[in-house]
Amino acid sequence: MAGAKALAANKWVDSSHMAIQGQSWGGYQVAYLIAHTDMFAAGGAGAPVCNMTSAYGGIRWGTGISRQFQYEQTQSRIGKDLWSGFDLYIENSPIFDYPKVKTPVLIMHNNADGAVPYYQGIEMFMALRRLGKPAWLLEYNREAHNLSNRKNAKDLSKRLSDFFDHYLKGAPLPDWMKPDTPYIINGQAKRLY
């Protein structure tokens, strides 16, 4: 936050139209920050973890390695297992603070992600939508943690531009972001509610 505040202090920065975007651990940071500040006009979260309590018991799909070490020892550095540090897992799981979210967010999470459980992006999206928050979820079938298909990468780039142009520059809401737009699963249009 110190860096964002330092940037906002510059005359050439419109501090009411700043955004945040991140992928993987950066996606987690976006998921966390939108629940703890309204400093950003919009956020983009790629492959985020939003609920460490549900992700803790998972595995890395590609290797079968437990995800527990990640929360105890590496990126999260909680230093305790889920049961002896339950309060720390809740505190570091932004989903429990989503009633406070004011920042619109575009989430991207793919169904072949072997690093971060795909259901984390779904949990984030469903929680925010259930709470009436502005949230969108993009999922690219058979794509992993990072996009490798050029067509999909271009699509994501275009949608990120649409999203940020709307919230940062006042561009019209793109059709794909409108509430009555169906989502597509395997070529079939569906509705969320």
Where are these regions (language model features)?
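Active-site-proximal cap/loop segments of hydrolase catalytic domains
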Residues: 1-193
